[in-house]
């Protein structure tokens, strides 16, 4: 009986090892260009660009530059940098909610 149990356990072990759930493959880190990694939204400019505040290491949200006489483009920086251009439109959009 012991030989039968050992055969069953050996069979179960080999079956489990060969047909076990495969671990999820780790995502390969793809180096993104600086322009895409530091951008704050689609088509809203990038941190550090002219008219935007902050840098790639600073969470920020950039808005399109208006045609009015504004030195900034309506950008809000969080953490590390000073919060700038906190106007009503920026606050209403929820951009500065985490500041």
UniProtKB/Swiss-Prot annotation:
Composition-biased stretches (Low complexity): 83-99
InterPro entries in the record: NICE-1
Residue ranges, compositional bias (Pro residues): 22-32
Spans annotated as Disordered: 1-42, 65-99
Domain of life, source organism: Eukaryota
Disulfide bonds: none
Protein name, per record: Cysteine-rich C-terminal protein 1
Organism: Homo sapiens
Lineage summary: Eukaryota, Metazoa, Chordata, Craniata, Vertebrata
Gene that produces this protein: CRCT1
